[in-house]
Amino acid sequence: MMENLLIPPPPWTGRMDGTSSHHLRWHQAVTPLQDGVEPGACVFIGFSSDEGVERNKGRRGASRGPDALRSALSSMALAEPLRAYDAGTVAVTDNRLEAGQEALGAVVAATLDAGQFPVVLGGGHEVAFGTYLGLAQASVRTPGKRIGILNLDAHFDLRSDPVPSSGTPFRQILEREHAAGTTLQYSVLGISQPSNTTALFDTARGYDVRYLLDDECSVSDRHRVAVFVSEFLSDVDLVYLTIDLDVLPAAVAPGVSAPAAYGVPAETIQFVCDAIAASGKLAVVDVAELNPSFDIDNRTARTAARFIHRIVTKRIPIVR
């Protein structure tokens, strides 16, 4: 029997300028998820985990990421009303990462089956395997539907470690697909060559992973990035977008386990998020690796919240 690791959502609080739609902020729009919610809403799902990062020899602290993201998003202004809910947080304790990933998968699948848009707040990048499990189990994945994962990340996360970690999720996913006789397209934007060994590049080639290096994603490279995203979208029917915040420069995102010496500009990441959200193919998104312990002036959380805000407001219909 699957463990119930879901804890209730915290209250969303923030600045209050008024109660009309002209004064609306996120904390006024988000309510706890209830049974019987109509399709078409955004549902936030937290994934509180340090276990995968620790197994990958990283810095602990990502377990506090979900609440930091909620806090950063709370006071952002909404231009139009929309329906948004919080399902709570899957909390990984006592080294039970695999149980946590299964529990997250169950929540994501239920959210998709209810016709909602899941937004998963990590947590280390081990969150990715749980998010994928949800998409793989959901009814939206019908035979013949082509699945694509676009990872905005400095790392391939294709390690072959003996135990699952934040460095292994996409190898786990690709191996699971192969065992099931199915396939998906895995693409990565923002790869840092010095942060990935030759063995990892060889693994990526073996799995036919498409990627752009971080130094190919500057603002002046907009056309190259646009072509990369367009080709990705043309080959898939359903998209899982995953944002590892260490893809950003350290000055923008200091609050991660492995800050980037170079990184991809926020302008490029926002451009990609906008394109994916507007494609009509985005099924689920997650944000990973926020570590509030190292987040100077909440820079990383605020930047991540901006991306979430853009994605959701482009993906979810407004309420008239």
Curated annotation (Swiss-Prot):
NCBIfam families: hutG. Mn(2+) 1 binds at residues 125, 153, 157, 244. It comes from Rhodococcus opacus (strain B4). CDD domains: Formimidoylglutamase (cd09988). It comes from the Bacteria. This is Formimidoylglutamase. Transmembrane segments: none annotated. GO terms for molecular function: agmatinase activity; formimidoylglutamase activity; manganese ion binding. One of its GO terms (biological process) is L-histidine catabolic process to glutamate and formate. The lineage of its organism: Bacteria, Bacillati, Actinomycetota, Actinomycetes, Mycobacteriales. Binds 2 manganese ions per subunit. Belongs to the arginase family. Pathway: Amino-acid degradation; L-histidine degradation into L-glutamate; L-glutamate from N-formimidoyl-L-glutamate (hydrolase route): step 1/1. It is an enzyme of class 3 (hydrolase). Catalyzes the conversion of N-formimidoyl-L-glutamate to L-glutamate and formamide. The keyword Nucleotide-binding does not apply. Its EC number is 3.5.3.8. It catalyses: N-formimidoyl-L-glutamate + H2O = formamide + L-glutamate. Mn(2+) 2 binds at residues 153, 155, 244, 246. Keywords: Histidine metabolism, Hydrolase, Manganese, Metal-binding. Its cofactor is Mn(2+). It holds the Pfam family Arginase. The keyword Kinase does not apply.
